[in-house]
A protein has these predicted regions:
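Bacterial N-terminal signal peptides that target proteins for export
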Residues: 1-8
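Bacterial N-terminal signal peptides
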Residues: 9-16
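Carbohydrate-interacting/catalytic domains
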Residues: 19-82, 88, 126, 272, ...
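Substrate-binding/active-site clefts of carbohydrate-active enzymes
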Residues: 34-64, 68-79, 85-199, 217-227
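Hydrophobic faces of well-ordered beta-strands that scaffold small-molecule active sites
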Residues: 48-50, 81-83, 134-136, 204, ...
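Active-site beta-loop-alpha junctions enriched in small/polar residues
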Residues: 55-57, 86, 139-141, 209-211, ...
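Conserved short secondary-structure transition element at the edge of the structured enzyme core
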Residues: 316-334
Length: 454
């Protein structure tokens, strides 16, 4: 058991949100003093995660080529680099030409497509030199069909009624592991330990963290690995119980709720109801991962432009300001406008035709430097502001003298809003630099977003 008493209470006692005004004229933030003794999981409260798709990141698709982008990602402001799985991919029952990252045939080796173990070590070292953290995508649920365990330790695997090793859904390229067996769990944890000891990574993004994987696996994993160093654990699962052991969980429900609003299936008011429900289920302390895209959404559901249309910026502002820990997927910051092939080579075009880099840089910086927007109990609880329009979402967040006010038109039509005492005075819209007279604000353009720092 590790998370709340150690990570949350320590921060509260350390006074992480003892804030002082920032010196810059545009009031970007009131700087917060971070505790000297804070661990990485604690410090993640004001960080942004960046998902790295090595295969598609450069024409070469290697760690060495990716290293050239590290200074740019540092300038973007992202501080946690999540690498999709980097291990060798199975050949038996492989999907496509290159196969899925998530069909692993050796947990303790590097996919030669990406480079060598030494190459990855160098990437981690360079990231650390730039003050960034590295977490590795970990796939404990299944292996490739040509993983050595298939023949040497078939008892590690789940079997059907006929005694045959089984797979899940249409994932025909993977064999399902049985984590009710202590030997399976031990071998998996040993492999995770290898990457910490050999490459000095800072944590794990835990693929498919629930369902077939019992919570006691994560209890054993954190108990065995947390003493090695301060680790950050991100679960690809949307269930409160995961926070008994892990730091952050996917907020799939809010992601899909935003997509429903963009499609016109739900209103902004209904989106806020989803937020209230989420807070009721999880409380305010856990880190909830928010995003508008990731490798799954991009490959199978569509680009942000397909799913959000002209509203992609407004929904990005929402994910960075409502609560939780935000994430940017490879290429999102330059307007990636294609579904990246999942089993083939499909390089990202890094030409920022839509001019989005500065937009995302501003969002990352805003959240980094304003304690009101930090994750969990380190930031403020969102408070809805009534503007008498179901398509407009207005809210504020406050924390220790910091306050951010957000107004979002989440529709493709002009919207009228009612006056509210909380909307008063003339302020600068942080995102555009324009002055906004809140007292006289009556209409919002389609997908207009206003962010005020008070």
């Amino acid at each position: 058991m590790k998370k709340y008493s150690l990570h949350f209470l320590t921060l509260v006692l350390a006074g992480i949100c003892a804030c002082t005004p920032a010196e810059n004229g545009n009031k970007e933030a009131k700087k917060a003093e971070e505790p000297k003794e804070a661990t990485f999981p604690q410090l993640a409260g004001n960080m942004t995660i960046y998902e790295v798709n090595i295969r598609q990141f450069t024409p070469e698709g290697t760690f060495k080529a990716f290293n050239e982008h590290l200074p740019r990602l540092k300038e973007l402001g992202t501080e946690i680099l999540w690498f999709m799985p980097i291990q060798p991919i199975g050949e038996k029952n492989r999907k496509g030409t290159l196969g899925s990252y998530y069909s692993i045939k050796d947990y303790e080796a590097v996919n030669p497509e990406f480079g060598t173990l030494e190459d990855f070590k160098a990437t981690v070292d360079k990231a650390h030199e730039l003050g960034m953290y590295v977490i590795l995508d970990w796939v404990p649920n299944h292996t490739a069909w040509d993983h050595p365990w298939i023949t040497k330790h078939p008892e590690y695997y789940a079997k059907d009624s006929l005694g045959n090793i089984t797979y899940e859904a249409d994932w025909t390229d993977i064999a399902l592991l049985d984590h009710t067996r202590p030997e399976t769990r031990k071998k998996m944890i040993d492999a995770m330990r290898f990457w910490i000891n050999e490459t000095d990574i800072d944590g794990f993004r835990c693929d498919h963290a629930g369902h077939e994987i019992p919570l006691y696996f994560w209890e054993e994993a954190t108990a065995a690995l947390d003493p090695l160093k301060d680790l950050f654990w991100l679960a690809e699962w949307d269930e409160p119980r995961m926070h008994l052991e892990l730091d952050a969980t996917y907020n799939w429900s809010i992601l899909h709720a935003t997509e429903d609003v963009a499609k016109g299936k739900h209103t902004a008011d209904e989106l806020y109801e989803s937020i209230e429900k989420d807070l009721a289920h999880y409380g305010h302390s856990p880190f909830r991962l928010l995003m508008t895209t990731n490798h799954d959404e991009n490959a199978w559901a569509g680009t942000v432009f397909e799913r959000y249309g002209e509203g992609h910026k407004a929904f990005a502002v929402f994910t960075f300001t409502i609560y939780g820990i935000p994430m940017i997927y490879s290429g999102q910051e330059v307007g990636l406008n294609k579904r990246l092939a999942f089993f083939e080579k499909d390089s990202i075009n890094w030409h920022d035709e839509k001019g989005l880099t500065d937009f995302y840089k501003k969002l990352v910086s805003l959240r980094k430097n304003n304690a009101a927007l930090w994750s969990g109990q380190y930031g403020g609880v969102p408070a809805k502001i009534d503007v008498d329009n179901e398509n407009v979402l207005a809210y504020s967040r406050k924390k220790d003298g910091n306050e951010v006010l957000v107004i979002l038109n989440l529709s493709n039509q002009q919207q009228e809003i009612a006056q509210n005492a909380e909307l008063s005075g003339s302020h600068q819209n942080y995102m555009t630099g324009e002055q906004v007279d809140l007292s006289g604000l009556k209409t919002l353009k389609p997908y207009e977003y206003i962010v005020i720092i008070k």
